[in-house]
């Protein structure tokens, strides 16, 4: 019995105190033996609280960049043989970048163009055309951002400002701006049937020259139909003789005397002749 009692007393002396003591007092030197257990117990109690608070908090409203992507509101019209007119919706953003490149060159862009910070409508001139009139497929991508300017959000879109991370100070070219690109694939041959396609439209100078030449041709044609008739008739021999006889006949013909005055004229002429004879006979005897 004594050895068993001694073993029980030795085991009881080695057990730590259950309550109080220096090990439970906060701020005292030394680490309690059950510090890891207390830390894990504290974490187990704090984790459900964090999860509960996160679940109860309302979800934050996302900005325009997190909203579901709207369909591409891009339209392309062909103005002339080598120019395109591009339009897109303003709600896509204020500052937009536009990329245009060909896609049917087996990985190489036969034509590529980039426009930085532009707005609709945009006229793209001097468009590169494939040699030989081959079919040319193009891809047009418009990327817009809301960082440097915002317009009124479209109907149904969230009104809260997007929570962008604070940009670090530095040059503007180092501060990235989110861009949301929307691409449109099309072919130049497909644009011929659109209302905006006017392949035969020419510059104003060519139009004026064409109108002037048309007017000259019409006037010359009318003159050619009218003028040759009298000109040709005037240079013919019969026409020349007829004109000469017609011009000389009025000058050679004597003055016409009326029929009623013939007898009076003859009597007057006879009286004049008798008077002349009497004067002559009277003067001769003297």
From Swiss-Prot:
Could you identify this protein by its name?
A: Transmembrane protein 158
UniProt function note: Receptor for brain injury-derived neurotrophic peptide (BINP), a synthetic 13-mer peptide.
Residues crossing the lipid bilayer are 215-235, 263-283
Report if keyword Transmembrane helix is assigned: yes
GO CC field: membrane
**Origin, by domain of life?**
Eukaryota
> Where found, per UniProt?
Membrane
Question: PTM comment for this protein?
Answer: N-glycosylated.
Q: In which tissues is it expressed?
A: Ubiquitously expressed. Brain is the major site of expression.
């Amino acid at each position: 019995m004594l050895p068993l009692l001694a073993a029980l007393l030795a085991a009881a002396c080695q057990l730590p105190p259950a309550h109080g003591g220096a090990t439970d007092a906060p701020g005292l030197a030394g680490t309690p033996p059950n510090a890891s257990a207390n830390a894990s117990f504290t974490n187990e109690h704090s984790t459900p609280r964090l999860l509960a608070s996160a679940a109860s908090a309302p979800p934050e409203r996302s900005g325009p960049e997190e909203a579901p992507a709207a369909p591409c509101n891009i339209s392309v019209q062909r103005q002339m043989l080598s120019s395109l007119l591009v339009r897109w919706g303003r709600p896509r953003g204020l500052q937009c970048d536009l990329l245009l490149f060909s896609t049917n060159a087996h990985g190489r862009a036969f034509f590529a163009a980039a426009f930085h910070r532009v707005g609709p409508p945009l006229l793209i001139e001097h468009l590169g055309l494939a040699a030989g009139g081959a079919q040319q497929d193009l891809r047009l991508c418009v990327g817009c951002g809301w960082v440097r300017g915002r317009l009124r959000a479209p109907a149904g879109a969230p009104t809260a400002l997007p929570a962008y991370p604070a940009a670090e100070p530095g040059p503007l070219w180092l501060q990235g701006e989110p861009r949301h690109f929307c691409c449109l694939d099309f072919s130049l041959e497909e644009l011929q049937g659109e209302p905006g396609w006017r392949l035969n439209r020419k510059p104003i100078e060519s139009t004026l020259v064409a109108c002037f030449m048309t007017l000259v041709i019409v006037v010359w044609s009318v003159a050619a139909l009218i003028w040759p008739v009298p000109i040709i008739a005037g240079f013919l021999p019969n026409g020349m003789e007829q004109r000469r006889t017609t011009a000389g006949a009025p000058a050679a013909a004597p003055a016409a005397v009326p029929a009623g005055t013939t007898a009076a004229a003859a009597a007057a002429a006879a009286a004049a002749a008798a008077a002349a004879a009497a004067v002559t006979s009277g003067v001769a005897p003297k």
